[in-house]
Amino acid sequence: MPIRIPDNLPAVEILNSENIFVMSEDRAYHQDIRPLKIAILNIMPTKITTETQLLRLLGNTPIQVEIILLRPASHLSKNTPEEHLETFYKTFDEVQREHFDGLIITGAPVEQMPFEDVNYWEELKQIMDWSKKNVYSTLHICWGAQAGLYYHYGVPKRDLPKKVFGVFEHNKIKEHVKLLRGFDDIFFVPHSRHTEVTHEDVAKIDDLEILAESKEAGVYLVASKDGRHIFATGHSEYDPYTLKFEYERDLEKGLDIEVPKNYFPGDDPAKEPIVRWRGHGNLLFLNWLNYYVYQETPYDLTNIGK
């Protein structure tokens, strides 16, 4: 089934070229189907790239989804044209009286700052509080996962001695969990971060379950026992060249950055990267949408939280 997004969003042309079914708003309005209503709070600086990556995964499922793009009003984006934001994005003030089947909170390159020093932290706290009664299930990604774990459960983020950067092997540590259905015994996920949440800190919280982790990258998937909060510390949505872009960007800035691990053949940046996480990324988003949103959300969204 298709994703339903604004007619002129730049991602439309890219996704159509990849044979991902994208439905125009006009066509969708003439179908007698209630699509899942999914909001994406996009706090990445490269918003157009990130929205395309997420829409690619959301559009590769058999479930019709209506997408609402959100941005923090308290933050001025330096890397995305204001015209794009004004045309395709809404602010929290515009949607706070609405209800959603699902919410995705993206990562952001601010993990080395205390949460309270991030200029949109107060607004993000307001959104996460609102989500308890207005969103059925929320998927938090990378720094968004750290922020959600800290806000909802008091789990701290801790500095790493060096950046976790590359594509790493992961293992399931729970069986018979719907989010993990169909996962390989060993699966790969990109990571790009300077901080972590530790197994010990998460394990102290009775309401949380650690579902998957990596010997090198640490805790990866965490879920609340009711399935309404999913936390993914990696970037399964990344496209083939995102880590390459980040590596070259940091080199240009003169930063001390290592070649991303297990990404370039022979760790040679002159070679084409190998994508090992595409299947996992598609399955993660499919399982979240199907088992944690579609099969659980009330038909009348105003019944969320009741």
Curated annotation (Swiss-Prot):
Site note Important for acyl-CoA specificity, residues: E111
Binding residue positions for substrate: K163, S192, R249
Localization, UniProt: Cytoplasm
Pathway it works in: Amino-acid biosynthesis; L-methionine biosynthesis via de novo pathway; O-acetyl-L-homoserine from L-homoserine: step 1/1
Major location (coarse): cytoplasm
One GO CC annotation: cytoplasm
Keyword vocabulary terms for this entry: Acyltransferase, Amino-acid biosynthesis, Cytoplasm, Methionine biosynthesis, Transferase
Residues at the active site: C142 (acyl-thioester intermediate), H235 (proton acceptor), E237
Annotated site residue numbers, Important for substrate specificity: S192
HAMAP family named in the record: MetA_acyltransf
Free-text function comment from the UniProt entry: Transfers an acetyl group from acetyl-CoA to L-homoserine, forming acetyl-L-homoserine.
Protein name listed in UniProt: Homoserine O-acetyltransferase
